[in-house]
Amino acid sequence: MSEQIFELKGNLFTLSVLHLYSTDINLLAEQLYIKIAQAPKFFEGAPIVVNLIEIKNNSLDFVHLKSLLERMSFNAVGVCNGSDEQHTQAKAAGLSVLNYSQDVKSESVKKEPNTSIVEKTVHLPAQIINGTVRSGQQVYAKDRDLVVLGAVSHGAEVIADGNVHIYGTLRGRAIAGAKGFKNAHIFCNRLEAELVSINGNYWISDSLQGEHWGSAVQIQQKNESLEISALVKG
């Protein structure tokens, strides 16, 4: 019997989800272009899933949609929360259909812009990285804090559903509160980041290069924006 050369295992990966509210692909292209221009490296090659929960008809051109996403350097993985007909059309366009259990279909489209968000407190022990997160690497601490005892290099990305603690220099990207925990913080010993994000609010390098650039800081969300303050050293 020959030696087994593969093994199939389940795993978890971080995917961006595009919540689509219109079938107008041209308008989507315009708005995506503006969004991507704010942080082009952050979205480059990012795997993305299109959430169809708010699309109530079958007029969406999935071939055009897939082409648009790939043209903008996304990796179009598939769709979720669509109708059977939408899923059939998506498959014909070369998109996968994913089950997305975190989304609950609403009975009707809500007209009020305010949405209730239930925060999930992180209880699991922190995930600790004993060293530097190097360029091209991505670390995700699911349902917990992330502690990096070294630096986060350019082109590296650290993500946590809770807080992110970096005991070295943050040169790459740090994302805290990835599942909507708005009270998450990012702490780092030296701020030189490409991007920081908390609960979906993010700043890129140009916005960070102020008085706290190169310093030890904590970053938190206040009033739907980010706030940076110096870490007090005892």
From Swiss-Prot:
Keywords assigned: Cell cycle, Cell division, Septation
Query: What's the protein here called?
Result: Probable septum site-determining protein MinC
Give the record's subunit note. Interacts with MinD and FtsZ.
Q: Which NCBIfam families match?
A: minC
Q: Name one GO biological process term.
A: cell morphogenesis
Record SUPFAM superfamilies: Cell-division inhibitor MinC, C-terminal domain (SSF63848)
> Pfam families from the xrefs?
MinC_C, MinC_N
Family stated for the protein in its record: Belongs to the MinC family.
Which species is this record about?
Pseudoalteromonas translucida (strain TAC 125)
What does it do?
A: Cell division inhibitor that blocks the formation of polar Z ring septums. Rapidly oscillates between the poles of the cell to destabilize FtsZ filaments that have formed before they mature into polar Z rings. Prevents FtsZ polymerization.
Q: Which gene encodes it?
A: minC
